[in-house]
Amino acid sequence: MQNSTLIDSFGRQVTYVRLSVTDRCDFRCIYCMAEDMTFLPRKDVLSLEEFALLGRAFAELGVTKIRVSGGEPLIRKDVIQLFESLGAINSINDLCLTSNGSKLTELAKPLVDAGVHRINVSLDTLNEQRFKELTRFGDLNTVLKGIDAALNAGFKKIKLNSVVMKNYNLQEAADLATYALERGMDISFIEEMPLGEIHSHSRDVEFISSDELRNQLSNSFELTATNEHTGGPSRYWKARDYNAKIGFISPHSHNFCDTCNRVRVTASGRLLLCLGNEHSVDLRAILRAHPGEIEPIKEALINAMAIKPEKHEFNLEEEPQILRFMNMTGG
C-alpha cells in the first residue's frame, strides 16, 4: 500500500476521508439536528462532479478509504453516479457509505454494483414509537426492510451504529446488539457528540460512557476484547457464540485522537481537519476558481495538514463549542 503524502505536524498519516455529499435528510434525529432545520442553498453545495474530483485528489495523495455520508446521502439525486466514479479509482480499496437506511430497499443492489464495499446503517431502537420519537420523521419498518435488502445485496460488510442515550434507548442496547449479531452484522455503540445547539434533551444528563454500557452488555454477552480495527475509531469486543462483534466509539471517555487518520469534507466544501474543532479550509473556492483542475486541490490538501490539531476538546458540561450540526459535519 502506498504511503500517504498527507502527514500532519504530529506525524499522523491521513488515509481516510469522509465526504458529506448533502446536509439534507429525510429524518430529524434529535441528537443530529433541529426539527426546523435550515439547509444550505443548493448553489453552496458541491456538485457530484466536484466531489468526484476531490476523491481523485485524495486518492492521488495516498488516501485509500472514502466514506460517503450526509445528511442522508441516498436522497441526493443521481448519487449513484458519484459512487461509480469513486468506485472506479483503483487505489481506493475501501469505499463505504453511512446511511439511515430509508432508501436501501431500492438502492442497495445499485450501490454494490457501483463498487461500494461496506455500509453503516444508523439504528437506535427497535421500538416503532421510540423510533418516531428519536427520528421525528422516520419509519422503522422501512429501515428494517432496507437492512434486509442490504444483507441480500452482496456488500462485504454491513455494520449498525447506535447512539445511546440513558433515558431514551439504553434499555434496548442488548436487544439492538442481538438483532445485529444474529444477522452477522457488527454494531457500534456511540457516545453522543456535542455538535450544534439542541433543545430536545440535555446531553450531560443523557450521557452514558462506553465502559458503563459495556459492563451492562456483559450481563447479556460474554465479551472479549480484540485488536481489530476497520480504519475508524471503534474499539471492538468479540461476543461469544457470534461471528460478529460489538464496538464502542468513545469520543468523551476514550478519545481516539492519537491515531486519527481522517479528515472530512462538508457538503459546502469545507475541509474539516478535526471533528471537534473548527480548523478548516475552503475547498469550494479552489474548486470553482480552477474548475476541473486537480493540482490546486492537491496543493491545498497538503498545506492543510499543518493546521490539523492534536486533539478535540469535547466537554459535556459546557455549551457546545462546535455550533455546526452533525448533518453539516457528516455523520
UniProtKB/Swiss-Prot annotation:
Its cofactor is [4Fe-4S] cluster. [4Fe-4S] cluster 1 binds at residues 25, 29, 32. S-adenosyl-L-methionine binds at residues 31, 71, 122, 193. Coiled coil: none annotated. The keyword 4Fe-4S applies. Pfam families: Fer4_12 (PF13353), Mob_synth_C (PF06463), Radical_SAM (PF04055). SMART domains: Elp3. One of its GO terms (molecular function) is S-adenosyl-L-methionine binding. CDD domains: Radical_SAM, Twitch_MoaA. Its EC number is 4.1.99.22. The keyword Endoplasmic reticulum does not apply. This is GTP 3',8-cyclase. It comes from Saccharophagus degradans (strain 2-40 / ATCC 43961 / DSM 17024). The gene is moaA.
